[in-house]
Structure formats: C-alpha cells, structure tokens
A protein has these predicted regions:
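Alpha-helix C-terminal capping segments
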Residues: 18-23, 27-30, 50
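SDR active-site strand-loop-helix element
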Residues: 8, 30, 55-59
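N-terminal Rossmann NAD(P)H-binding glycine-rich loop of SDR-like oxidoreductase domains
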Residues: 2-23
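NAD(P)H-binding glycine-rich loop region in Rossmannoid oxidoreductase-like domains
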Residues: 40-78, 89
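Ser/Thr-centric signal marking residues that sit
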Residues: 8, 62, 83
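Adenosine-cofactor binding site in Rossmann-like domains, unifying the SAM/SAH pocket
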Residues: 25-45
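Conserved Rossmann-fold NAD(P)-dependent oxidoreductase catalytic core, especially the SDR/UDP-sugar
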Residues: 84-95
Length: 95
C-alpha cells in the first residue's frame, strides 16, 4: 500500500474532488473536529494517531471573495496562521 497522506480540510471543495477522482493514493481526509489547524495540539494529535508520511494542506478559506471581506480576521487566521501551524508541525515531525 502507498504511503498515507493526511489531507487537511477534508470536507472542503478540493478534498471533495480528490475523493471523487483518487484511484491510487492512500488518503486520510481530516475533518475540522479532527484537525483544527489553529490549534497545534490538535494537529499533533492527528499526526500521532494516523502517522502520515505526507501532509496535503487543503484547509482554509477560498472563494467567494465575499467570505474574506466579511470576516477578514477569520480569513487571516485560517489561511495564514493555520498554514504556519501546519508548517511548524511538519518541521517538528519531519514531514
């Protein structure tokens, strides 16, 4: 079996396409309640639990742009702070 890949944003638009199209990759789609990218301990827990070899970071806010304009702090938190947290954890776990 291929290496396990943790997909953040497992309920999002891109993850939905991956679920439909994927035929060969070993993907684990993390839901928000399993992997809160704003919480370092939440990210650590899922990594320790499923032991992925790769993280495919798909969590965050994207379109429509009105979402960002309506709540800019949420957009910054998810897209910048969340991504920074994923990067820190990847470095810590050598992923």
């Amino acid at each position: 079996m291929s290496q396990l890949i943790l997909v953040t944003g497992g309920e999002g638009r891109f993850a939905k396409i991956l679920k439909e199209k994927n035929k060969s990759l070993n993907l684990y789609f993390a839901k928000k309640n399993q992997c809160n990218i704003l919480n370092l301990n939440s990210i650590k827990r899922i990594i320790k639990k499923i032991k992925p070899k790769i993280i495919l970071h798909c969590a965050g806010l994207s379109r429509p742009m009105e979402i960002h304009e309506k709540d800019i702090s949420k957009s910054i938190d998810l897209n910048i702070i969340g991504t920074s947290n994923i990067t820190k954890i990847c470095k810590k776990f050598n992923l």
